[in-house]
Swiss-Prot record:
Its EC number is 3.6.4.12. Residues 248-475 form the Ku domain. Residues 591-620 are annotated as: Disordered. This is ATP-dependent DNA helicase II subunit 2. It catalyses: ATP + H2O = ADP + phosphate + H(+). It is found in: Nucleus; Chromosome, Telomere. Transmembrane segments: none annotated. Heterodimer of Ku70 and Ku80. It comes from Yarrowia lipolytica (strain CLIB 122 / E 150) (Yeast). SUPFAM superfamilies: SPOC domain-like (SSF100939), vWA-like (SSF53300). GO terms for biological process: DNA recombination; double-strand break repair via nonhomologous end joining; telomere maintenance. One of its GO terms (molecular function) is ATP hydrolysis activity. One of its GO terms (cellular component) is chromosome, telomeric region.
C-alpha cells in the first residue's frame, strides 16, 4: 500500500515576484512567480494523475492583499492566506487556486510566519497518523523574513518530522558557479538567513529554483510497492516419488522484477448539449462519460425485427469444430481443465549459453528466501552461487495459483551486495515460437536445390564488403562513448519510454494552461537516443563512405504516387526516359502519324498503348519486389490519364502473378512460400497507396483460383490460407 503524504506549498506573492526575465531554453520573458509555479503545477498535476486519496495538498500565499489563516487574530500573521486547505486536489481545485496565485501590490507579510501556518495545517490534518509530511517554499528572497523565534519553529518542524524544502529563484549556487548580478543587499542577507534556518532543520533541503526546474526535464519513474506473487517451496526432485532425504525444499517468496509499463489511454466521451456561445474549450464541464450496454440476440422470425433478445445468464460456452459448435457443460468443462496446484519445481539445469537471448524478453520475477527465515535465505543464496559458478541456468515448472496454467521458467542467479537470490523469466512453449524459413545471408540454393552458391557478384556480399561492415559496426560501438564523470553514455536508468512520458506531459500542460491548441514539444531527454551519437557518426564517416562505395548506394528520391487532376501532355517528339538517362532519342514520326490516324478509334489507341506497355514490362525473378515498385512508379509517371495508368498497372499485376506461378512450379515443397507472401504483401501495399485495390484483388483471385484447382503442382492449402489472410 502506498504511503500517505501531505504537502503544503508556501508561495511568496511579493510584488518583486512579478519581475520579468528571459528564462528557459527559448529565453522567453517570464515573471519570477510564473517561472517558479511551473514546478509546483507539475508536482500537483502528478498527484492529480495518480488519483491517490491519501496524497493531499494545501496552498498558502504570503504577502497577499487579505488575511485568512488560523492565526489571523495574532500579530505577525497578517497578509497570509490559506488559498486551499489540505485536500485531495482535482483540476477544478487547481484552476481555482491558480487565479489567486498572482503578485500583489501590498508587500506586508512574513515568509517565516507562512511556514508556521503550513506547520499548523499539517499538524491539524495528519494528527498522530503515519504520514510523509512536506512543506515546499517558493520565494525570491526579497520579502520580509522574521527569524526572531526560529528555534521554536525548527523544534516544531523536527518534532513533527516535517521535511522543509526551500526553492529560491535566482539564489546563488557555488556548486555550479552561479551568482546573480546586481543582487540587492537585503536579498543577499535573506538568502544567508534562510540557508542557516534550513540547515538547522532535519532532512530539509535548500536549493536554487533552477535545480528544481531542471528536475522537471527528467521523467519520474513511478515508484511501485512490491506485491508478493507467490509463496511456497522451491522443490528439487519429486516429493511424492522420492524419500525426504533426496528432496531439496527451500521456502521462497516471488516478487515482480520487471513489468511492461503502459502509456495513458484515452477514453470515449460525448459532448454535452451546451449552447455554442458558452463553449470555450472541451473541458470536463461539457464532456459526458460514455457507458457501454451490450445486448445478445439470436435469429428468430417470430421476434421483433426477426431477432430474439437473450439474457447473459442464459448463455452457454461452446467450442467451434469446423462449421459446428461443440457444447460442453460447465461441469464437463471443469473436468477437462488441466488440474494444477501452486508450486515451483526444478526440472533440470542447462548451460546458460543454450538459452537464446530472444527467449528472455518477457517479464521477470525475483525469488528470495522466505522473509524472517535465515535458513531459507542462506539456502537460496547458495543455490544462486552454485548456478553462477557453473555458468548454468535452472529450468522449473511454475504455477502461481491453484488452477492456473503451468509455465516453464528459467532460473537465473542474481547476486548483488544487497541481495543474493534468483530471477526467473517465462520461456515459450513449442506452440508459442514462430518458426519461419528465412533465406541465408551468406549462401544461395539453386532452384533445383542440388547446388549451393557461396559467391555471387550481385546477390551475396564479398569478403571486402563484410570486412567493411565489421569496421563500421566497430566504429559505432557505444561502449567507447563516455558521459560526464566517465559514466557510460547509455544507461538503462536514462532510457525512458517516450510515449508514456510525452503523453503524460501533454495532458498535464493542456490541463493547467487550458490551451488545447498548443502541444508542448517532447522533453530533450526523451529524444536523446532517437538519433545516433554525433561523436560516433563523425568518427565512422570514413567507414560509412567505404560502405556506400562498395554497395553502390545511391540516394532515391520519392516520386509522386498519385495525381489529383488529369494533366494534358503535348507531343514533344522526345523520349522523356531517354532524356533522363542522358540519351537523346527522337521518337519516330510514324508514331505521331499513327496517333492522328486512330483518333476516331479510341478503343484501338488504348489497346495499342496497353500492348506496347506489355512488351516493355520485365521483372527480375531474383529481385521481384524492388523491380515491381520501380516499374509501377514508372507507369504512374508516364501515364497521362487514370485509364492509361490502370491499364498498365493491371498488366503489371498480371505479369507479376505469372512470375510467381512459375517460381512456385519450379520450387521444392514450401521453399518459395515466404518469398511469394512477401511479394503479394508488397503488391497489396502499393495497390492501397495507388488507390487501385480492385486490381490487386483481381490478380490475387486469379492466383488463388489456380491454387485451389491444383493447376500449380497439386493442392497447396497452406499457401492459400496465407494468401487469403493478406
Amino acid at each position: 500500500m502506498a504511503s500517505k503524504e501531505a504537502t503544503v506549498y508556501v508561495v511568496d506573492l511579493h510584488e518583486s515576484m512579478g519581475r520579468e526575465m528571459a528564462r528557459g531554453h527559448d529565453s522567453k520573458e517570464v515573471t519570477d512567480l510564473n517561472w517558479g509555479l511551473q514546478y509546483i503545477y507539475s508536482e500537483i498535476s502528478n498527484k492529480i494523475l495518480s488519483g491517490r486519496k491519501t496524497d493531499v495538498v494545501g496552498l498558502v500565499g504570503v504577502h497577499t492583499d487579505t488575511t485568512q489563516n488560523m492565526f489571523e487574530e495574532e500579530s505577525g500573521f497578517e497578509h497570509i492566506d490559506i488559498i486551499t486547505p489540505i485536500q485531495q486536489f482535482n483540476l477544478d481545485t487547481l484552476l481555482e487556486a491558480k487565479k489567486q496565485l498572482v503578485p500583489n501590490s501590498d508587500n506586508k507579510g512574513d515568509l517565516i510566519s507562512g511556514i508556521v501556518v503550513a506547520v499548523q495545517m499539517i499538524k491539524l490534518y495528519t494528527k498522530a497518523l503515519k504520514y510523509i509530511r512536506n512543506i515546499v517554499v517558493l520565494t525570491n528572497g526579497q520579502g520580509n523574513m522574521n527569524l526572531g523565534d526560529s528555534g521554536g519553529i525548527i523544534k516544531q518542524l523536527n518534532e513533527n518530522r516535517i521535511i522543509l524544502k526551500v526553492m529560491g529563484v535566482d539564489f546563488d549556487d557555488e556548486e555550479v558557479d552561479y551568482f546573480e548580478e546586481d543582487k540587492p543587499e537585503h536579498k543577499r542577507e535573506n538568502e544567508l538567513k534562510l540557508k542557516e534556518f534550513v540547515d538547522r532543520c532535519e532532512d530539509s533541503v535548500f536549493a536554487t529554483y533552477k535545480e528544481a526546474r531542471d528536475s522537471l526535464d527528467i521523467p519520474k519513474v513511478k515508484a511501485v510497492n512490491p506485491v508478493r506473487a507467490f509463496q511456497g517451496n522451491l522443490v528439487l526432485s519429486d516429493p511424492e516419488q522420492q524419500p525426504p532425504q533426496r528432496v531439496m525444499s527451500i521456502g521462497v517468496e516471488v516478487f515482480p522484477c520487471t513489468r511492461r509499463a503502459t502509456a495513458m489511454t484515452a477514453s470515449s466521451y460525448a459532448m454535452s448539449k451546451i449552447e455554442p456561445a458558452t463553449i470555450s474549450t472541451p473541458s470536463q464541464n461539457n464532456l459526458q462519460a460514455v457507458k457501454w450496454d451490450r445486448q445478445y440476440y439470436v435469429n428468430d422470425e417470430s421476434g421483433i425485427g426477426g431477432k430474439k433478445e437473450l439474457d447473459r445468464d442464459t448463455l452457454e460456452n461452446g467450442y467451434r469444430y469446423g462449421s459446428e459448435i461443440v457444447y460442453i457443460t460447465k461441469e464437463e468443462e471443469e473436468a477437462i481443465m488441466f488440474p494444477t496446484s501452486a508450486s515451483l519445481q526444478v526440472i533440470g539445469f542447462v548451460n546458460k549459453k543454450s538459452v537464446p537471448p530472444y527467449m528472455l524478453m518477457g517479464h521477470t520475477d525475483y525469488i528470495i528466501g522466505q522473509r524472517g527465515n535465515n535458513r531459507d535465505a542462506v539456502a537460496i543464496s547458495a543455490f544462486a552461487r552454485a548456478l553462477f559458478e557453473t555458468d548454468n541456468f535452472g529450468l522449473a515448472r511454475y504455477v502461481n495459483k491453484d488452477g492456473k496454467d503451468p509455465q516453464i521458467v528459467v532460473l537465473m542467479p542474481y547476486i548483488r551486495a544487497e541481495l543474493e537470490g534468483l530471477v526467473f523469466c517465462q520461456l515459450p512453449f513449442a506452440e508459442d515460437e514462430r518458426k519461419f524459413i528465412l533465406p541465408s545471408l551468406t549462401s544461395l540454393e539453386t532452384r533445383s536445390g542440388n547446388k549451393t552458391v557461396t559467391t555471387h557478384s550481385r546477390l551475396l556480399p564479398t569478403k571486402e564488403m563484410l570486412d567493411a561492415m565489421d569496421d563500421y559496426v566497430d566504429a559505432m560501438d557505444l561502449s567507447k562513448l563516455k558521459g560526464e564523470d566517465d559514466e557510460p553514455w547509455l544507461t538503462m536508468e536514462e532510457c525512458f519510454n517516450p510515449s508514456i512520458h510525452h503523453i503524460r506531459n501533454v495532458v498535464k500542460e493542456c490541463a493547467v494552461s487550458q490551451d488545447y491548441g498548443k502541444i508542448p514539444e517532447p522533453l530533450p531527454i526523451l529524444t536523446r537516443f532517437s538519433q545516433p551519437a554525433e561523436e560516433l557518426t563523425e568518427e565512422a564517416k570514413p567507414q560509412l563512405e567505404l560502405l556506400k562505395h562498395l554497395f553502390d548506394i545511391k540516394e532515391q528520391f520519392r516520386e509522386a504516387k498519385k495525381r489529383k487532376t488529369e494533366v494534358t501532355v503535348g507531343q514533344t517528339g522526345l523520349d522523356l526516359d531517354a532524356l533522363l538517362e542522358g540519351e537523346l532519342e527522337v521518337k519516330l514520326e510514324s508514331s505521331q502519324t499513327l496517333s492522328s490516324n486512330v483518333k476516331s478509334e479510341p478503343g484501338r489507341q488504348t489497346a495499342s498503348q496497353s500492348s506496347q506497355n506489355s512488351q516493355q514490362l520485365s521483372l527480375d525473378p531474383e529481385n521481384i519486389c524492388p523491380d515491381f515498385i520501380r516499374t509501377l512508379n514508372k507507369i504512374d509517371t508516364k501515364a497521362t490519364s487514370d485509364e492509361e495508368f490502370r491499364s498498365g498497372a493491371t498488366n503489371l499485376y498480371k505479369q507479376t502473378i505469372t512470375l510467381l506461378e512459375e517460381k512456385l512450379e519450379s520450387s521444392k515443397g514450401n521453399d518459395a512460400y515466404n518469398e511469394i507472401i512477401g511479394v503479394l504483401q508488397t503488391m497489396r501495399e502499393q495497390a492501397d497507396e495507388m488507390e487501385i485495390p480492385d486490381v490487386f484483388t483481381a490478380a490475387k483471385g486469379q492466383f488463388v483460383s489456380k491454387l485451389e484447382r491444383g493447376d500449380l503442382g497439386g493442392q497447396k492449402n497452406v499457401l492459400v490460407a496465407q494468401i487469403n489472410s493478406i
